[in-house]
Regions:
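Cationic, amphipathic, low-complexity alpha-helical segments enriched
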Residues: 1, 5-22, 26-29, 35, ...
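Short, Lys/Arg-enriched N-terminal segments with co-localized hydrophobic residues
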Residues: 40-42, 46-57
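Selective transmembrane helix interface/packing segments
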Residues: 52-394
């Protein structure tokens, strides 16, 4: 009987103490036999600690499957914002540079230096009617621009941007990153062919077929132009290729791989311009011959998606050129991210200069250059590089 009375008194005392405890500690009391000290705090192994109140460390959150996907979604959102911003100002930079090349002012009315011109154009296109021609395959007609813009952005998941302190600016560091970029980028040909076929327009169809022939013709030369780089570095990981430039030979500074594979660089630049359907290789959308090519029947946001995919692809091949031939984010004392941006901007200017300088090639000249010019030269470059590596390495 005495034991029961003492237990009842203990329970009533614990209940009174529980009402005066802070909520985190009070919530931890699960059994009436928990012991308290004179200050009303839990005593023994059940005591509330600072680690319990602050929660698990970040590493445990990332290791958790849900936390891992949260980090991935946040990273992809930030990357999407950065690439969209870069694309918008690439269009502005191109229009200003072409204006200077052609001795005209370019966009200078909306905002300071015309910086808000792209926002005005985007709002205008967003409110335009998205006209769908009659007798079209509506599913494919809508799917085609979605494939184009999705493939363009997906390639950036494996492209490293650089370092900033201890932070590493890339999402996925895979050991076959360059192959993944090529595989995703090759989906662009399906988007163009499907868009041309589903539009029920002869000019759109001809533009789509031209694009398919052009991309297939130059993809092989583009891939073979990079094989000597892979042979020298011994890796397909983009980060390894960028870091190789600071560890090559007896040098301590960045040694760009263009000095080792200059022919591969020239082939890459020409093939990359053709792969992105840019002037002077913009045959799929030749206005004088095909009105607008595969874009003839597209308007509104669907046209914007194709337009956006073209410029994202242009930034992608410029970033790859900086990584594969010019040391990526290594540029002496310049911070890595800024060094990478400087190199990408220089390649973008090269694209714009080519558009403002050279006329469009004829279709037969384009095919002859791809099959009889670049492809044999790329194969010979691979063979010569292999012979030199065997001779040097023994």
């Amino acid at each position: 009987m005495g034991g029961a009375v003492r237990a009842g008194r203990r329970a009533r005392r614990d209940a009174r103490l529980r009402r005066h405890l802070p909520h985190p500690a009070r919530d931890r009391i699960q059994d009436p036999g928990a012991r308290f000290d004179g200050a009303g705090a839990l005593a023994g192994p059940r005591a509330d600690t600072r680690a319990d109140r602050t929660g698990p460390p970040v590493s445990q959150i990332y290791d958790n499957p849900i936390g891992h996907w949260v980090v991935v979604v946040v990273a992809m959102t930030l990357l999407l914002f950065v690439v969209l911003t870069a694309t918008a100002y690439t269009v502005w930079f191109e229009r200003v540079a072409l204006g200077r090349i052609q001795r005209r002012p370019g966009p200078n009315r909306v905002g300071p230096f015309g910086l808000l011109q792209l926002a005005a154009d985007g709002i205008k296109l967003a409110f335009k009617e998205s006209f769908v021609p009659g007798k079209t395959d509506k599913v494919l007609y809508v799917l085609a621009p979605t494939i184009a813009v999705g493939a363009a952005f997906l390639a950036w998941a494996v492209i490293p941007i650089g370092l900033w302190g201890n932070a590493q600016y890339w999402i996925a560091d895979v050991n076959v990153g360059i192959l993944l970029v090529f595989a995703v980028s090759s989906l662009n040909v399906y988007a163009i062919v499907i868009g041309g076929y589903s539009s029920n327009n002869k000019y759109s169809l001809l533009g789509g077929l031209r694009s398919a022939a052009q991309l297939i013709s130059y993809e092989m030369a583009l891939g073979l132009s990079l094989v000597p780089t892979f042979m020298i570095v011994g890796s397909l990981r983009l980060r390894d290729i960028a870091e190789y430039t600071v560890h090559w030979g007896p040098y301590t500074g960045p040694i760009p791989l263009i000095l080792l594979t200059p022919i591969g660089f020239v082939i890459y630049i020409i093939a990359a311009v053709a792969e992105t359907n840019r002037a002077p290789f913009d045959l799929p959308e030749a206005e004088q011959e095909l009105i607008g090519g595969f874009l003839t029947e597209y308007s509104g946001l669907k046209f914007v998606m194709y337009y956006l995919a073209e410029y994202v692809n242009m930034i992608t091949v410029s970033a790859l050129a900086a990584l594969l031939f010019f040391g990526g984010w290594y540029l002496w004392v310049i911070p890595p991210v800024f060094a990478f941006l400087i190199k990408v901007i220089l390649f973008l200017f090269l694209y714009i200069w080519l558009r403002g300088t050279f006329p469009r090639l004829r279709y037969d000249m384009l095919m002859r250059l791809g099959w009889k010019g670049l492809l044999p030269l790329a194969v010979a470059n691979v063979v010569v590089t292999a012979i030199i590596l065997v001779a040097v390495q023994g």
